[in-house]
């Protein structure tokens, strides 16, 4: 221990049952010997030291000795994991020196263009949890005002290089990604087994929900374990040609996960940040060919074909600079895909499609076949234009279902009981007519209000889609909840706005 450290008061580390998300937080008593009012105040940034380990964290001060005593320092659960020193160990606390890269953040706020080196330094500090959420927000807001093509390339490269980088022996490694915003739409879980059954390599790393009722990882977790590390992932892909796992556990582009956790609550969703976010993860995952799905609709992330075209050009530009073959398609984003919204309901849709069940959602089946067809045609041995027929053969024959079961077995079948919520209510049409519009944002919010994705059995089962005729009092959808309080909140939310629009005739005036 250095002379400086030995002069500072030693505080005993205590585990505090606080989940502070991605931010490191430490708590000390107002009566602590280490608390000097002229140096420390609430929400100060501090540096914790123990042996050769250091940790930057946000400081909270408490008057409750039951939480931490005067000779203790409490670490939130994320901070305790990252510091990797056990409770009971002694550590010192001192004012933190701000990361040098914060000067680049200030420059960006002033409207300056950042160098590759400056962007790399910011991302490195982000990935090592040296920034507070406020400092991350400052970087995001500064970048949202403008970003040059050079900065976008530098940001993508830095984010891809910040975490695990996967390499595969196969010359063609395919992947697909949707920019999100459409309820249901669980095409990846149908596409992966189709493509893997054909023999192409498709190591799918997926996200968990942040503002939606379910991410692909949340839905796959109903069926199988998704917290899989990089080496185990490689073994699964070697055995099955594919997987569907949570990308966060593999540590692909960790800076992106941190940025997303701050930008989503602020509703910051710039096109440049989206491109860097998606492509950095695909580059880190070792993909050679990427199919991008851009849904377009009134309540989708993209509301017009012109918006989609601008985003498409940006994806293709960045992909080309990194040697990644990027194909972009626009799809119908006017309404949910599939009948279920929420992890259990979406998983049931997926297995119904793979099992060729009579009641399987036709829109999920058809969209999945179209996407799989594009990916299959990256196989040089497959005749051009034959992708759709091959995808349908693999689905109809049961080969895709068999491959999905193989992937589930390799990842490890889920051990949790995932049942639908037992508190349910129907939302009914208030008039006769034809469904002319469905608000995707509204249904996403309603499913989250019902408890998804935390409660995997919460969500919405749709009975009516655009173009369907309804009679007054006929159910539009059923909402499932697992908790009485969430049930009451969902009832109130649905009563305020059920998210459906009606017309008297097909393509008629909406009311």
From Swiss-Prot:
Reactions catalysed, as given in the entry: thymidine + phosphate = 2-deoxy-alpha-D-ribose 1-phosphate + thymine
Superkingdom classification of source: Bacteria
GO BP terms in the entry: pyrimidine nucleobase metabolic process; pyrimidine nucleoside metabolic process
Pfam families: Glycos_trans_3N (PF02885), Glycos_transf_3 (PF00591), PYNP_C (PF07831)
One Gene Ontology term of the molecular function aspect: thymidine phosphorylase activity
Keywords from the UniProt entry: Glycosyltransferase, Transferase
Claim: Cell membrane is one of the keywords in the record: no
Top EC class, one word: transferase
InterPro entries according to UniProt: Glycosyl_Trfase_fam3, Glycosyl_Trfase_fam3_N_dom, Glycosyl_Trfase_fam3_N_dom_sf, Nuc_phospho_transferase, PYNP-like_C_sf, PYNP_C, Pyrmidine_PPase_CS, Thym_Pase_Put
One annotated Gene Ontology cellular component of this protein: cytosol
Coiled coil region boundaries: none
E.C. designation(s): 2.4.2.4
Entry's family note: Belongs to the thymidine/pyrimidine-nucleoside phosphorylase family. Type 2 subfamily.
Protein name per Swiss-Prot or TrEMBL: Putative thymidine phosphorylase
